UniProtKB/Swiss-Prot annotation:
Originating species: Bacteroides fragilis
Domain of life: Bacteria
Chain's role: Involved in erythromycin resistance.
Family: Belongs to the class I-like SAM-binding methyltransferase superfamily. rRNA adenine N(6)-methyltransferase family.
Pfam families with a match to the protein in the record: RrnaAD
Protein name: rRNA adenine N-6-methyltransferase
Residues annotated as binding S-adenosyl-L-methionine: H14, T16, G41, E62, D87, N103
Gene name as annotated: ermFU
Length: 266
């Protein structure tokens, strides 16, 4: 008996073959016939073939040349499927609202998150992502050291749906996996200043062991820190990494109101 030939994936992707997982991912993403959905790392189309039955438009993105050819043949008659052969990091993300349902290449998880939840915050509505369990855990740490993680939680509701076993993939990964649900929050925020907000978070997290009081005093006056504490219920003695996403955003918006622009972090 000959061995089944497995695709070579330098970015660490393992193909989803679990139909229950696929169904759960699509259901969690709340896909409708009005949605444009990206399948990042589409592989052999295991997810795409289910998405095309529900979504208005599916964009299957794949970097492996042989698999791109396979996808184009497989979906040649599908009017609502577009196959794009490229590394997702070079993909021209839609300039209109879209969702993602994807078993992403594990090796570029951080890049994918930044592209979706920071660079394309304006149009990324959310979705479901199958990814390595370890980076998923870091998203839900009680203390948030990574400025991007704070940023993501500010604008998105993130939910770890469940852990996924290696038997759900081909080839089976040696690491644990998870299904992550992402849903953008309804916030009144000027997306044009998202980089300024990230700079604010990054500045205050440069010394993560500092207390909230000491960290805020690098930007605000002492009296302003006291006012902010009372206004937003801050524990000034806690570490700055213990602030909640809503507290981060409130502090930032307060900075825009009371601190001259020349003192804003950049």
């Amino acid at each position: 008996m000959t061995k089944k030939k497995l695709p070579l994936r330098f970015t660490g992707q393992h193909f989803t073959i679990d139909k229950v997982l696929i169904k759960d991912a699509i259901r969690q993403a709340n896909i409708s016939n009005q949605d444009t959905v990206l399948d990042i790392g589409a592989g052999k189309g295991f997810l795409t073939v289910h998405l095309l039955k529900i979504a208005n438009n599916v964009v299957a993105i794949e970097n492996d040349t042989a698999l791109v050819e396979h996808l184009r043949k497989l979906f040649s008659d599908a009017r609502n499927v577009q196959v794009v052969g490229c590394d997702f990091r070079n993909f021209a993300v839609p300039k209109f609202p879209f969702k993602v349902v994807s078993n992403i290449p594990y090796g570029i998880t951080s890049d994918i998150f930044k592209i979706l939840m920071f660079e394309n915050l304006e149009n990324f509505l959310g979705g479901s992502i199958v990814l390595q369990f370890e980076p998923t855990q870091k998203l839900f740490s009680r203390k948030l050291y990574n400025p991007y993680t704070v940023f993501y939680h500010t604008f998105f509701d993130l939910k770890l749906v469940y852990e996924v076993g290696p038997e759900s993939f081909l080839p089976p990964p040696t690491v644990k996996s998870a299904l992550l649900n992402i849903k953008r929050k309804h916030l009144f925020f000027d997306f044009k200043i998202k980089a300024k907000y990230l700079a604010f978070i990054s500045c205050l997290l440069e010394k993560p062991d500092l207390s909230v009081k000491t960290a805020l005093k690098s930007i605000f006056r002492k009296s302003q820190v006291r006012t902010i504490s009372e206004k937003f219920g801050l524990n000034l003695n806690a570490q700055i990494v213990c602030l909640s996403p809503s507290q981060w955003l409130n502090c930032f918006l307060e900075m825009l109101e009371v601190v001259p622009e020349k003192f804003h972090p950049s």
